[in-house]
Amino acid sequence: MEKRELKASVPKFDKIPWLSEASLVNKPLVLSLPRRYPHTSATFLTSSKKNMNLPILFQVPDVLSKARRNQCDSMLLRNQQLCSTCQEMKMVQPRTMKIPDDPKASFENCMSYRMSLHQPKFQTTPEPFHDDIPTESIHYRLPILGPRTAVFHGLLTEAYKTLKERQRSSLPRKEPIGKTTRQ
């Protein structure tokens, strides 16, 4: 049997055209990398003139600080659109809540706490409760009713019913005016 060596001719690239010495001396190489922030480019590839073989990867700290500042400004703009109580809650440390074993009771506690937050602080006379639209005639429908959304929908309807019952029970009831007989 004859042993034969296979040889393939592979072209040798001595100089890469876009990484030639002239292009390195004239201007730095800027690659189009995907940007983390659309308004800034934080990453550049440039070559050092001392070591021509390896490009140096560095990030400009000024650009990153500007990006962080812009992100913080957008958060402030978003908070300004909220009401004053929500904005106060954003700035205050979050409070710890003990969640009881009964999920229905914990949801009621959370809802009553949230409703108390949105009550106006300076209220001289309470406005009477006007039930313009009967809620029984409105059917809330979810787009896709799977097993998870069905459970969630059940929790929401139970919480909504208990909330309505509490609102109705907390309002002063009008006594029915009966006919009084004169004696």
Swiss-Prot record:
Source organism of the structure: Homo sapiens
Protein name: Uncharacterized protein C1orf105
Pfam families: DUF4548 (PF15081)
InterPro entries listed in its UniProt record: DUF4548
Gene (UniProt): C1orf105
UniProt superkingdom: Eukaryota
